[in-house]
Amino acid sequence: VVAEAAPTRLNPSVKWSVLIFQHMRRIEKYDCLPDMNSQYCSKHIAPHWLMRFFGAESATFQLAGKGLQVVTKNDDRYLILAESLANDGTFQEGTLFARLVLQTNTGPKTFSGLRKKDAQALFWWLREHWLRQLAPEVAKTAEDIRALLTQGYPRQSRLEVARAMAQQALARFVRVPEPEWCADVRDVPFKWVAVVAGWQDDDLEKLRQSYVTCQLQRYADFFTAVESQPLTERQREACVVDEDNNLVLAGAGTGKTSVMVGRAGYLIESGQAHASEILMLAFANKAAAEMQKRIDRRLGKCGITASTFHKLGKEIIARVEGQQPSLTPLAEDDKALALQVNQWFEEHLKTPAYQQLIIKYFQHHLYPAANPFDFESEGQYFDYILANDIRTLKGEAVKSLGECLVANYLFKQGIEYKYEPAYEHRTASPLYRQYQPDFYLPEHGIYVEYYGVDREGNTAPYVDREKYHQSMAWKRQLHAEKGTRLIELYHYELQEGGLFDAIDAQLAALNVEYQPLPPEAVLATLREFGAIRGFSTLLADLLKRYRANCYEKGQVEAAIANASNPEQVDAALSLLQPILNDYQALLDREGQIDFDDMIGKAVQYVREGRFRSPWRYILVDEFQDISEARARLVQYLRDAAKDCSLFCVGDDWQAIYRFTGSDLSFTTAFREKFGSTKITALDLTFRFNSGISDVATRFVLQNPVQVNKPLNTLDKVKHPTVSLLREDNRPRQNSDGPSRLEKVISRIADIAEPGSSVYLLGRYGFNLPDRRELQRLAVRYPSITLECHTVHASKGKEADYVVVLGLETGKFGFPTGKTTHPLLEALLPPLEGYPHAEERRLLYVALTRARCRVYLIADMAVASDFVVELLKGQYEIDLNEFSTSLSQHLLHMLKCMKCETGTMVPRQSQFGLFFGCNKFPLCAHKERGCERCESQMRRAGRFKICINPDCFNWVPVCPQCGAEMVQRNGRHGEFWGCKNYRHEGECCRHTENEIIFDQNLLILESA
């Protein structure tokens, strides 16, 4: 952007959008100037005769095709560089004579001893002819830059090309020529090119902002009328900005569909695109249909078509292959696909090679390897065991991967074993349970212990080293005393790869001979407990996941290398590959494709150039849900069309479909993935109030990976609009009071406007009331409308009120403790480092479905970690809308003392109610409830105190063994004795005459 006397940098006070259109038009064509390249011009100069005696030489200067060159008397030729003619220091005047110092392609060249008049005339001649030669080129460059920058929004790619063109031209003339250098040459193009060459990033941003301002003013009426409500300032800006790649971060309720419609309409209204040049993409048929309906209603039958990715892929395939592809029935019938995969699997199991592969997999690679020493607590290690459901080839649940490998090896070698049987001699006492060795080999009378120690004798961080070694010593002594045979195995042997050698050596020393089971026998055992059928189902899932990724060359190897357990993944894929071949052969034989082919083949055809993209503008809805394969297709389509712009609308806070292959990194790292990018955040939600927004936004932003974007609300409130009901979920006998859910629904019916909508949302479908219960509630509360949805199904919907159910901890809790199979995990996008990242976003989605108010229901005995976080973080939630018992106030603080991560939950046995760790049987810790009221008891110093405020019963704990102390009568009166006391045998004999209870312990921390 340049005026007649243009500065070298943009002046921020100038309206650059005006100047760029005014002054570019002033660039003139230089048709009147001679074409210097078509003429041969030369000028000879000789030094003063006197100076020739001192070595001064004559030369001829020529204007040739390559530019100005000088030819010396000796026929040496040099090309004169532009800086020589732009630099006033080239002509140097002395007392008697002058000289020219010219920069050439071989270095400086000096011509001295020249008459001043001759030297000056030559310099001006060189400069004039140089400018005459350059002027048309510079004018052409200026015109090309003008044409480039008047195509529309100043995209980074266009600006970089323009700046490169200008810098290349500037290198030819170095500086803007002065008017007296050549009267026939105008300096405007030179100035314009010099300014463009010197543009900085802030100059470019001002240029873009000026363009946006002009467009917003020009199309203000369009943006006011294109939707039922005028677009907001940010929505309009998002429609106008047309960078090479555009990301619109549209928070919940901010009107992303309005932006999609407004963007498409603006491109047509402004003449930047025809309808046939615009591609609009959605993920689901329903979403595409709704988008199409909205476009037709707001823009008329303009010719824009909203398509799904699969429909797009199918059209690309049809254009390349000349016919519409046929869809395999298996693509729409998961049960039929699973049956077909099972049939192929069973056929392969008949071959010896495949039998060996499957047995090796089950023996060594069925579970992901994990070192117990890498976990911080026993509870975390138990989480790993529970999540992977570690079982032997015989189907037994075991407590460690090492034990599983030992059992599998013994089984495969034909050695009968029993897992954790009671020792043949009685060892139980009031202090200790009966000893149960890890394994017993009944045919040989041999016990096996697998010790969790490293080579230095260290234990895992959460295991008391001294007590563990005492236990090891006690076991050795016991076997020695009773004369029973024991072999000992160690964790470090597994880590060092010598575990099976150790088993072989010790059993051989005891004269145990192996009788390896034939593969058929091993497979038969695996069938007995459903392992073969389960693996067949897994193969069907792996087949779908593998094909959905549409791998290109090298990507499979990368997926294996990046997996947390590469050997396990590699072993599984070797079993999957024959199934993949069978499936592809079936498709080829039938001449059919599946949904994954619609993406994969389209990617291939666009990449290879077999499909020519007609689209200059690609608009993608719900971009946070995009997979790597779909992102690849979008990138190839963008690169296949000249000046194609990518426009993506999504919200990283609502990315909840990783399990289908969605990769959030394409949103959070959009610029790194796609290149030059403009990010616009829609900052105003029309759905929920500030109370919901404050809680939901703060909650989701605990994950630092989420983009921190502003989100304002139209409805400002001064009181909490997220409420928590804390109530015991245990069924009570003879209790006919309302359920927790009905209490909330009754409350909503009392405060809501008639006709208000209420969503009941659950992490899983079984969290929700069944159809009969929902009908009963609907009849009882006719003033409100009730609907049930899983949180995933509620995405994109909204209601006046939302009730979130299933906020519990555990495998099917919220956040879910259920883990993705490690093999499927390896084929999914990389797992985020932040704990429960996607589950956190899922709760954000649940919260932001509500317009007026959200209700959370939880039992604090098994409360979700998210509920505990809301309480501990002192979020602005209403805790007083419903009455809450003191036990519910305290329960979330009562964790299992042994494993530290488990929660003590009520259980019933033949002896009555007790509280046990929810990680049982891995963690067997249990405690009695209060003898008076059956409520849970909390630990405070050496006391157990009932959490029931109407009871507050207390019991002292034995400092020797940890059992409860009870009052007894003796010869000298009452005393306190340990509950583990017995008159004979091993027991605890600790007694105390007096125990004083500290009443200050009743002052509860949570009060």
Walk through the language-model features, giving the residues of each.
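P-loop NTPase Walker
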Residues: W16, E57, T106-S112, V138-L327, ...
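C-terminal accessory regions
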Residues: E808-Q888, S909, L913
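Helicase P-loop NTPase motor core
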Residues: T257-M260, F375, A387, S676-K678, ...
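Conserved RecA-like helicase ATPase core segment
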Residues: S471, R476-Q477, A631-P720
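Conserved P-loop NTPase-based nucleic-acid remodeling module centered on helicase motor cores
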Residues: E277, A282-N285, A289-F362, Q477-T537, ...
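Conserved helicase NTPase motor core
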Residues: P177-W181, D187, A194-A252, T257-V261, ...
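Phosphoinositide-dependent membrane-docking surfaces
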Residues: L68-V70, D76-T95
